[in-house]
A protein has these predicted regions:
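Short hydrophobic alpha-helices and adjacent helix-cap/hinge residues
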Residues: 2-8, 12, 20-177
């Protein structure tokens, strides 16, 4: 049996080869680390259940950095989103927030500092082990998630099974599974 390749495919492959595009490196311009973190932050809220079936609407950040600017950029392009970005003067003045993102310099004393129903997220090493809920961890040029399900449960939050399948989970005992 003989396989036939459509003429359109042959012409396309020939055009790519002749123009030199086929010889270009496979790597395309990618996303920056702040853009990836911003995408995680804006999509993370869809995989977490808040107390009383409320829908998360507010992302609070402790400083205006590259990740904050990327979150703002994502939110400004989404027509269907009702998400709001609030840049805090300090963590002591926490307005009603559904998600609080902290950079690695501002995570000290996270345990018990925040209100029930606030998802805490940071990129500091050991954040989830210290009582934070979601930690961004850099692993081999990728951003991995570490989730402390015990801290989430104490705050009345529940991560979806789809989110947990993508993450390293730290239960209440503090050991990874």
């Amino acid at each position: 049996m003989r396989a036939f390749i459509p003429l359109r495919s042959v012409l396309l492959l020939t055009a790519l080869g002749v123009s030199g595009l086929a010889a270009q490196p496979a790597a395309t311009p990618g996303f920056t680390e702040p853009e990836i973190k911003a995408a995680f932050l804006t999509h993370l809220m869809g995989f977490v259940s808040w107390p009383g079936q409320q829908q998360a609407k507010t992302i609070c950040v402790e400083e205006d950095d590259a990740t904050t600017q990327a979150v703002d950029s994502i939110l400004s392009t989404r027509v269907d989103a009702e998400l709001e970005l609030i840049i805090l003067a300090s963590a002591d003045e926490l307005p009603p927030c559904d998600l609080l993102y902290m950079n690695s310099d501002t995570t000290e004393g996270v345990d018990g500092q925040f209100h029930r129903g606030v998802l805490t997220v940071a990129d500091a090493d050991g954040f989830a082990q210290q009582g934070g809920m979601v930690e961004f961890q850099r692993k081999a040029n990728r951003i991995a998630l570490i989730i402390n399900t015990g801290a989430m449960h104490e705050a009345g939050l529940t991560a979806s099974s789809r989110l947990l399948a993508l993450a390293t989970v730290i239960p209440t005992t503090g050991r990874e599974i």
